[in-house]
Amino acid sequence: MFDKFPNSQVDRAPESISQSKEYYVRAFEGSADRASKRYPKLPYHHPGHMEDVMQAVGELVKLLPGDGYPRVITPWQKDLLALAAAWHDAGFDDKAARAYPTKEEYAIALMKEDLKSNEIDLTSSDIAFLDRAIRGTIMVPALQQRDTPEAKLLHHADMAYMTADWETFWRGAEAFHDEEHPDILGELPEV
């Protein structure tokens, strides 16, 4: 998932990123594994949703125009987007999340703690990129922050099931409905 950026990308990275490509692949994969353990086991929000969003964001980046990909999202940023996708709903139903204005801010705090405690060496610019991407998944209209390419891409990846084939869409819609409205018994009507 993370082995996308060329070696020269790390060589051109800011001096504070002093590790090798292999280091980042291992570090990001480890971080994504730890993120998956922070996901609840709800009908919609669960580790499978994390994996779906990670895959969808990679597919969306591939859809960018050929001349737009390097300018809008670099290969390094594509890997950062996959990492943001891994953390975007981490801790979704933790009681501690209630102390934050949004569950996305809690997910960002969890991600930053993971990066720090595992000594994953990223620049402040990279951390800000991850932060903006995750904030792009905020659903409350008054709090939405989708004014950057990374925020827009992660938001659309988070909602990708809505544009999938009918079976995938319906499965996602039912899971989301069951999670959001557990008090309403029964399945959605057949269409």
Report residues per predicted region.
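Hydrophobic/aromatic-lined pockets within catalytic cores
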Residues: G91, K95, K112-I120, Y161
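Histidine- and acidic-residue-rich, metal-dependent catalytic cores
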Residues: V53-V57, E104-Q144
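His-Asp-centered metal-binding catalytic motifs of divalent-metal-dependent phosphohydrolases/nucleases
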Residues: V53, W76-A96, A107, L130-I138
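Amphipathic alpha-helical interaction segments
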Residues: L64-D67, F92-A97, N118, P141
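Divalent metal-dependent phosphate-bond-processing catalytic cores, especially two-metal-ion Mg2+/Mn2+ enzymes
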Residues: F2-S16, K41-Q77, W87, M139-V191
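Active-site flanking loop/helix segments enriched in acidic
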Residues: A27-A56, A90-A96
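Eukaryote-biased recognition of C-terminal alpha-helical segments
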Residues: Y23-Y24
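Alpha-helix N-cap and loop-to-helix initiation/capping positions
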Residues: A99-K103
